[in-house]
Design a protein with these regions (language model features):
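Glycine- and acidic-residue-biased ligand/ion/polar-headgroup-sensing regions
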Residues: 48-59, 64
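Short, surface-exposed secondary-structure edge patches
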Residues: 31, 51, 67-68
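Short acidic-glycine-tyrosine-enriched beta hairpin
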Residues: 66-81
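Ligand-binding loop in jelly-roll beta-barrel domains
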Residues: 81-106
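Short glycine/proline-enriched turns and hinge-like loops at secondary-structure junctions
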Residues: 44-46, 90-91
Length: 106
């Protein structure tokens, strides 16, 4: 399977957009699209390890309401299961992030 990320690109003036890339038995991948100023609110990933790879734009990720990380293109970010995070587009242009989630345990 392969998908062209450019062809999947989609933004909304109302809120962030999440598009599924694939879903397996223990893992899945999504693309997150945010216009400047938009954010994905804090949400937990109790049973998933999360890897993020920004492809376009700049933003911040707040982890567990304590750590703020700058998101920059072509950098890999990993958060263990149980983390809660928020993503915000702080740049002047669109932010696009590939997110993979891997289920841990049963």
């Amino acid at each position: 399977m392969h998908k062209n990320m450019r062809e999947m690109e989609q933004y909304s003036d109302d809120q962030f957009v999440v598009k599924g890339v694939y879903k397996g038995t223990r893992s899945e991948a999504v693309l997150l699209f945010l216009k400047p100023g938009q954010e994905m609110p804090p949400h937990p990933h109790e049973r998933f390890e999360v890897t993020l790879v920004p492809h376009k734009g700049r933003g911040t990720m707040t982890v567990n309401d304590t750590k703020e990380v700058e998101l920059v293109p072509e950098t890999l970010y990993y958060e263990p299961a149980g983390s809660t995070f928020r993503i915000r587009n702080t740049g002047d242009g669109p932010l696009q992030v590939l997110i993979t989630l891997v289920r841990v345990g049963e």
